[in-house]
């Protein structure tokens, strides 16, 4: 029988994470997450990346693969003293966030992907984008990237990483001003040129929106202004 749900998935993923750490005791949390996500297998059917993430965990690949692909990102958090600081962190997904419409231009934003080769031989990868089909369900609303000429490009379509080295690749989302407002999703596929069976994927998502309100002043008695209460 097939059983689903977070209560079943969580202990399975925790067990797989334990196997990864047993094989790689020096891994940090971001390394474990990247190992789980990079090597995940594509599911049958059409889903939002917010429903299935990178896909189905491949235990053997997650434990034994020699490559890691981590996205560098930032977030603003409260410093506990009434101010804010920029926190830099790594993850296994490309979250481009909200892209605001500009008149008569292509709207872009980018992130850096770090390709790390922990193996003993150099590897060359072909990099391409795969776009999710439009979805309009109760749980997901995904716009048609192909029909709206929305693209995700990388600074190089072919990337060689020397043994024991790391290489930075810039991923950019490009959204024409004429594109439909909405959510665009898909995957960046990374395939070993000499061995297509070695392949990895990074989910991506972005929202194309009209520019919203820049500043809001709230009444303190109604909504707290203490940053440690809502550091976002």
Regions found by a protein language model. Give the residues of each.
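Hydrolase catalytic cores
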Residues: 1-47, 178-181
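Short, solvent-exposed loop/turn segments enriched in Ser/Thr/Gly
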Residues: 105-112, 167-169, 178-187
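Intrinsically disordered, low-complexity Pro/Gly/Ser/Thr-rich segments with frequent PxxP/GP/PP motifs
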Residues: 142-177
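Short solvent-exposed strand-capping/beta-turn motif centered on an Asx-Ser/Thr pair
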Residues: 104, 115-122, 132, 178, ...
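Beta-sheet-dominated interaction scaffolds and their linkers
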Residues: 59-120, 221-232
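Terminal connector regions
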Residues: 176-214
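Low-complexity, Pro/Ser/Thr- and charge-rich linker/hinge segments at domain boundaries
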Residues: 206-230
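Short acidic, flexible loop segments centered on an aromatic residue
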Residues: 119-147
């Amino acid at each position: 029988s097939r059983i689903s749900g977070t209560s079943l998935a969580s202990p399975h993923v925790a067990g797989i994470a334990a196997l990864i750490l047993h094989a790689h005791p020096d891994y940090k949390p971001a390394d474990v997450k990247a190992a789980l996500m990079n090597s995940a297998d594509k599911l049958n059917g059409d889903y939002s990346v917010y429903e299935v993430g990178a896909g189905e965990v491949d235990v053997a690949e997650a434990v034994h693969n020699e490559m890691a692909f981590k996205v560098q990102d930032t977030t603003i958090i409260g410093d506990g003293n009434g101010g804010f600081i920029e926190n830099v962190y790594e993850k296994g997904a490309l979250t481009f966030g909200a892209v605001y419409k500009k008149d008569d231009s292509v709207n872009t934003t980018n992130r850096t992907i770090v390709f790390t080769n922990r193996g003993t031989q150099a590897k060359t990868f072909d990099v391409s984008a795969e776009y999710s089909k439009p979805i309009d369900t109760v749980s997901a609303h995904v716009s048609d990237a192909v029909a709206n000429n929305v693209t995700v490009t990388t600074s190089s379509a072919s990337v060689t990483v020397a043994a024991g080295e790391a290489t930075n690749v810039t991923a950019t989302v490009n959204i024409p001003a004429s594109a439909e407002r909405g959510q665009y999703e898909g995957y960046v596929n990374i395939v070993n040129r000499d061995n297509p069976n070695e392949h990895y994927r990074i989910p991506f998502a972005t929202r194309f929106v009209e520019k919203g309100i820049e500043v809001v002043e709230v009444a303190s008695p109604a909504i707290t202004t203490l940053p440690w209460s809502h550091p976002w």
